[in-house]
């Protein structure tokens, strides 16, 4: 009898492994099989009976994981908080580690394999997977920072019910790089600008100076060439779905002007949230205090943010 009870309990544990539930909100592993491996994600489902609207959340640039955390910038849990708040309001969500990042690290054997379109094509496959899941009635995209451009591009390739842009850059990446590097000494910009313009034209650059290897090493050039092809304003203008553009006025990385540029492309007025920074939190206006929020995983989202997102999804 004791053995039978043990086996039943063990079976239940195996079934529940990878699933968690908090306050009626359930999280489970939700993965996408692609050529060469698996992209690992998390599905957060509200309490109650579906089908539910579902939002696919795409993280920002670099080593940012599904929760919005990065070994470079720190842990802020911003994207995880969005998922939880959506579920609390009856909306499911999918968030995932991009190929080459965190649990999905194994999909990239070499940095030179990765191009910007990989992220776009992966997201299209996620949209198709969610669209074929009977638990979901409609699919929305939430893209943060670089993830906003990736989500926008994916929305031009397949049908979605809406797109939420969070802290999306308004200019092509090559313009951003040139602008950021313009603060460097002239001898640096004299070297970097010609390299950027060559990459913009789709040509690789040999013999990059040692001091610029971190930016323009051979293995990253294919990604830069592919990324430079995309003009966010043009891409946003090609989306055939409802769009909302949300930007904080306390963002150290992306400006209100970026949001206005994107708004012109999409033919709408952006939503500007006073006091919100790049990681979607309410932050001090000084740079030091602002950056400290990047490493506070318990600091809540800006109080106005989720109302904007939830109202948009519910009304579209």
Question: What label would you give each PLM region?
Answer:
Residues 49-51, 55-85:
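Short, surface-exposed "cap/lid" segments of acyl-processing enzymes
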Residues 77-105:
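Conserved alpha/beta-hydrolase
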Residues 111-133:
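Alpha/beta-hydrolase active-site loop
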Residues 252-258:
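Conserved alpha/beta-hydrolase "acid-adjacent" motif
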Residues 164-234:
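Accessory cap/linker subdomain of secreted extracellular hydrolases
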Residues 22-50:
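N-terminal cap/lid segment of alpha/beta-hydrolase-fold proteins
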Residues 239, 245-247:
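Short beta-strand/loop motif that positions the catalytic acidic residue
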Residues 129-182:
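Primarily recognizes the serine-hydrolase "nucleophile elbow" in alpha/beta-hydrolase
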């Amino acid at each position: 009898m004791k053995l039978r009870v043990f086996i039943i309990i063990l079976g239940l544990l195996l079934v529940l492994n990878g699933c968690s539930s908090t306050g009626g909100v359930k999280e489970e592993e939700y993965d996408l099989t692609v050529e060469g491996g698996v992209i690992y994600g998390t599905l957060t489902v509200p309490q109650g009976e579906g089908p539910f609207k579902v939002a696919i959340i795409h993280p920002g640039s670099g080593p940012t994981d599904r929760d919005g955390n990065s070994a470079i910038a720190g842990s802020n849990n911003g994207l995880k908080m969005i998922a939880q708040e959506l579920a609390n309001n009856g909306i499911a969500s999918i968030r995932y580690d991009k190929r080459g990042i965190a649990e999905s690290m194994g999909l990239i054997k070499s940095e030179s394999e990765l191009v910007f379109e990989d992220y776009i094509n992966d997201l299209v496959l996620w949209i198709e997977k969610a669209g074929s899941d009977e638990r979901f009635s409609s699919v929305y995209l939430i893209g943060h920072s670089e993830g906003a451009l990736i989500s926008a591009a994916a929305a031009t390739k397949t049908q979605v019910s809406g797109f939420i842009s969070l802290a999306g850059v308004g200019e092509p990446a090559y313009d951003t790089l040139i602008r950021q590097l313009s603060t460097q000494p002239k001898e640096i910009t004299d070297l970097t600008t010609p390299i950027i313009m060559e990459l913009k034209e789709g040509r690789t650059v040999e013999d990059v100076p040692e001091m610029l290897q971190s930016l323009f090493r051979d293995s990253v050039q294919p990604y830069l060439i592919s990324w430079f092809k995309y003009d966010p304003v043009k891409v946003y203008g090609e989306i055939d779905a409802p769009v909302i553009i949300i930007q904080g006025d306390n963002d150290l990385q992306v400006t209100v002007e970026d949001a206005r540029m994107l708004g012109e492309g999409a033919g709408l007025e952006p939503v500007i949230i006073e006091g919100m920074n790049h990681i979607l939190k309410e932050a001090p206006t000084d740079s030091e205090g602002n950056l400290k929020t990047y490493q506070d995983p318990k600091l809540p989202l800006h109080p106005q943010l989720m109302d904007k997102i939830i109202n948009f999804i519910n009304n579209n």
